């Protein structure tokens, strides 16, 4: 960590998100492993489920409030809440307080928790120090690999995750970051957008994967499992790595793999 880095807490919460919990649990385990590697204890409230974003972005505010309220009651201690998804972190930071604009006690609770939320890539860079040699340590995996970075729309624009994610990748020995032509564009997931408009979503993800292939990337890394699910399944439908498609991996899992922690594999529960 640099002198300007936030102090390292003794404990943190991890809010895994519903997608990680149900579809990509290894990504959550890898994030927890990286935090514990730094000597930080992890609290994982068993009752956590969803941030409420699917209902919220579909216009079902009452339903979103019920889901969000259930999460608010889980985080009682004054400690960071690490979220391995920029999209969900953005929901918690920017939209939870708005959801409870007419409920003063809940709004105060939402604002307190919003101030505790830290998106994973920021935490990994600024607190764990994984973008500098001291925090990274001697990374045992140095095999050369070309990596493209994808940040979800809300992660990039609401939470500013592009710079820390890029810094974390750049610090890893043997990793070459390649620039894909559609780096700032949506992958077509967009939460429920991919279900409501599958043909448009399919065209968008095909364009994204084509740009990644043209850049020569072997691995496509993102800190958002929603996007990764979309990208992974689209890549598999086109033949997977055997046909030149990139391997899709959560940032936490890629870091864990290169650092030498157990796990590191992108495992999707179909």
What name fits each language-model region?
Residues 1-270:
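Iron-sulfur cluster-binding electron-transfer modules in prokaryotic oxidoreductases
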């Amino acid at each position: 960590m640099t002198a300007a880095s936030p102090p390292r807490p003794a404990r943190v919460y991890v809010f895994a998100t519903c997608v990680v919990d149900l579809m990509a649990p290894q990504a959550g385990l890898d994030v927890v492993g990286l935090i514990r590697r730094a000597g930080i204890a992890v609290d994982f409230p068993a009752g956590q489920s969803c941030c409420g974003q699917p209902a919220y972005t579909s216009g079902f505010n009452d339903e979103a409030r019920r889901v969000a309220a259930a999460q608010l009651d889980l985080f009682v201690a004054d400690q960071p809440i690490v979220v391995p998804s920029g999209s969900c972190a953005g929901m918690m930071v920017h939209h939870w307080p708005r959801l409870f604009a007419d409920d003063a006690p809940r709004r105060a609770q939402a604002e307190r928790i919003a101030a505790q939320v830290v998106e994973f890539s920021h935490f990994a860079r600024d607190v764990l120090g994984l973008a500098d040699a001291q925090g990274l340590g001697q990374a045992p995996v140095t095999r050369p690999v070309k990596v493209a970075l994808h940040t979800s729309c809300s992660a990039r624009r609401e939470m500013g995750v592009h710079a820390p994610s890029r810094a974390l990748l750049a610090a890893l020995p043997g990793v070459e970051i390649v620039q894909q032509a559609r780096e700032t564009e949506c992958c077509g997931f967009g939460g429920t957008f991919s279900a409501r408009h599958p043909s448009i979503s399919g065209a968008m993800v095909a364009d994204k994967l084509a740009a990644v292939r043209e850049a020569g990337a072997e691995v496509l890394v993102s800190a958002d499992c929603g996007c990764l699910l979309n990208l992974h399944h689209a890549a598999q439908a086109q033949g997977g790595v055997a046909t030149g498609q990139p391997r899709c991996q959560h940032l936490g899992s890629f870091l864990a793999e290169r650092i030498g922690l157990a796990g590191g594999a992108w495992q999707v529960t179909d």
